[in-house]
């Protein structure tokens, strides 16, 4: 960390150009003077001091010196790792507040809120080769199957005196599981420090600290390092849209709205009861961009998924008429947020080659994944395809009798599949708040639900776009995700259908990763060809996926056939490539997957909803196949 503060570092912070503000601000050990230096931005404060265990929380003991720009600093002797501290801020409004350090690397576990003096030990990373290969491994033509995870409830200790597993314990259980299931990436719901469990981490008070619920920064280092050693990339949920009003956090930090807006029509998010960042302030941009960079620089994270991008882009998001202020041209676009997102993506992607930035953006805002070289591009690598998720779940919830009248829901996604670089998400948001679990969303009785979910997952795995599934969905947990209880792992051990479904998802991942036709041309229309698109009466679709052509490399083609009804169609015609010799790769009706066993090497036959994947070869022609 920086031994001294120089004017250039402060200039970068004040102009929105800082990318490593964490080296200047916060608490840092100074080897030369054997002191700890504290630095904080509080431009409108009347006074700031450091208080903690070491001075009996006395605001008069260690007053900080402020400059003309409101940057306060002090060096204190005799501190040790783990000492508790806060800033005592006498605000512009005359109110004295005890504030956590916005740049703290570690903090007390809730409900306590003090920051901790924390000097990073020399953790011995062993993932250099993995990091060096990131650019090649995370290109658009590589497979990506993401397991979305909430660390606190994936597995929980059975001992009453323990609330959570440690980062290290989680790593030792999670890594073999991800390997067994064939996932390429894991996405962690927010682990930046937060006070309220039921926010799931989406109301952040510590943008530079991993939550102490699961251990120390060194424990988190261990988890990331071990995941990398196992070949698994790590994506973090990161929340730069809004922050909570908690007294110890960023709100009214110096008695004024330095991180948000003074006008509540600009600075308040009524749906969530939170405050919106003011991206027009260069210091706020420096603070947030440096936070994302910190996790890439220090913790070796491979990507971030940015939550609630729509709430950033639209001034009227979640608001009624009169509750927001239009921009200067009278529209609802937040141009300051657009500027911030472009700066963020450019900083991360140029500094860390192959780094993933993923937008959870629920509207049709254009060019989310266009490069920042495009004046209108936001610069993300991927965008969640929320439309695909909504349409496919709506379709699968229908009685099969009515699916023919809603056939567009299952095919519409291909009309815009190449407008952005998409991830197809079945995330935590879809299995909470009474929405039902993935298996319970499916129409029908017990066996039909499983047949339908196998079909949906198979269809999704073959559909253009990268993949994401929230924990529990891989073994068809019947209850919704419960944010205070672990997953129902007993289902795999005690119920054959759940065990078989679990194996089916692992098989899908295995096939997906081993077949370039299923991922290489996700962003290229040349990699997809409809065979059957509009047969609404039978609720059948069929399409071919293709890999890249290359010198000395034969193009592979994979046929996907989906029957979305429990009907058996006799001598059903599917247009297939000329002189096709079909070899079945997967049939969701196989007994091993919980199906009825109605399978054949020479036929695609079924009495249930199902999906089949088959090898074929080029040049289309109508060929009669029995169904």
What feature does the model see in each segment?
Residues 41-47:
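Short proline/glycine-enriched turn/loop motifs at strand-loop junctions of beta-rich domains
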Residues 109-151, 407-453, 460, 602-603, ...:
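Glycine-rich phosphate/pyrophosphate-binding loop
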Residues 300-302, 317-485, 492, 513-516, ...:
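Conserved alpha/beta catalytic core and glycan-binding cleft of carbohydrate-active enzymes
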Residues 487, 493, 501-502, 508-510, ...:
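C-terminal accessory region downstream of the catalytic core in glycan-modifying enzymes
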Residues 615-622:
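Conserved small/polar residues in nucleotide/adenosyl-binding loops
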């Amino acid at each position: 960390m920086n031994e001294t503060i120089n004017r250039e570092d402060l200039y970068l912070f004040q102009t929105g150009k800082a990318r490593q503000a964490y080296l200047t601000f916060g608490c840092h050990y100074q080897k030369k003077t054997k002191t700890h230096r504290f630095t904080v931005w509080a431009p409108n404060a009347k006074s700031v001091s450091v208080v903690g265990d070491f001075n009996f929380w006395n605001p008069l003991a260690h007053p900080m010196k402020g400059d003309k720009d409101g940057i306060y600093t002090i060096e204190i002797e005799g501190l040790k790792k783990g000492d508790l501290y806060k800033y005592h801020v006498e605000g512009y409004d005359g109110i004295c507040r005890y504030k956590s350090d916005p740049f703290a690397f570690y903090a007390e576990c809730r409900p306590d809120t003090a920051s901790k003096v924390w000097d990073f030990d020399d953790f011995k990373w062993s993932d250099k080769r993995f990091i060096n290969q990131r650019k090649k491994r995370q290109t658009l033509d590589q497979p990506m199957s993401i397991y979305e995870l909430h660390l606190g409830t994936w597995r929980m200790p059975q001992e009453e005196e323990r609330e959570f597993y440690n980062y290290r314990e989680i790593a030792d259980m999670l890594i073999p599981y991800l390997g067994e299931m064939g996932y390429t990436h894991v996405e962690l719901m927010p682990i930046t420090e937060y006070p309220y469990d039921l926010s799931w981490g989406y109301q952040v008070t510590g943008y530079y600290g991993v939550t102490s619920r699961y251990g120390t920064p060194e424990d988190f280092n261990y988890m990331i390092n071990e995941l990398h050693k196992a070949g698994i990339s790590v994506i973090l949920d990161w929340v730069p849209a809004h922050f909570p009003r908690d007294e110890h956090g960023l709100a009214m930090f110096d008695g004024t709205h330095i991180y948000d807006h003074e006008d509540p029509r600009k600075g308040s998010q009524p749906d969530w009861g939170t405050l919106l960042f003011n991206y027009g302030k260069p210091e706020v941009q420096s603070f947030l961009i440096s936070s994302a960079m910190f996790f890439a620089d220090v913790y070796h994270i491979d990507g971030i998924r940015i939550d609630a991008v729509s709430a950033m882009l639209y001034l009227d998001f979640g608001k009624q008429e009169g509750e927001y202020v239009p921009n200067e041209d009278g529209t609802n676009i937040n141009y300051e947020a657009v500027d911030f997102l472009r700066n963020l993506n450019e900083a991360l992607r140029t500094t860390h080659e192959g780094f993933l930035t993923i937008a959870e953006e629920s509207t049709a805002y254009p060019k989310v994944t266009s490069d920042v070289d495009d004046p209108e591009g936001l610069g993300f690598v991927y965008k969640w395809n929320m439309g695909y998720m909504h349409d496919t779940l709506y379709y699968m919830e229908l009685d099969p009798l009515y699916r023919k009248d809603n056939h567009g829901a299952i095919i519409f996604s291909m009309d815009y599949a190449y407008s952005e670089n998409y991830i197809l998400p079945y995330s935590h948001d879809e299995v909470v708040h009474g929405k039902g679990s993935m298996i319970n969303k499916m129409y029908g009785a017990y066996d039909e639900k499983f047949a339908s979910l196998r079909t949906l997952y198979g269809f999704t795995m073959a559909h253009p776009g990268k993949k994401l599934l929230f924990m529990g969905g891989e073994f068809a947990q019947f209850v919704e995700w419960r944010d205070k209880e672990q997953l129902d792992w007993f289902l795999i051990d005690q119920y054959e259908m759940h065990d078989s479904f679990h194996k089916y998802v692992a098989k899908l991942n295995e096939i997906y990763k081993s077949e370039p036709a299923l991922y290489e041309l996700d962003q290229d229309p040349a990699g997809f060809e409809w065979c059957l698109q509009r047969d609404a009466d039978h609720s059948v679709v069929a399409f071919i996926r293709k890999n890249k052509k290359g010198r000395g490399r034969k193009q592979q083609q994979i046929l996907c056939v989906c029957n979305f009804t429990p009907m058996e169609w006799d001598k059903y015609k599917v247009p297939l490539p000329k002189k096709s010799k079909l070899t079945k790769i997967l049939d969701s009706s196989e007994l091993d997957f919980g199906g009825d066993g109605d399978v054949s090497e020479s036929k695609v036959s079924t009495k249930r909803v199902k999906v089949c994947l088959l090898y074929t070869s080029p040049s289309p022609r109508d060929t009669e196949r029995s169904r």
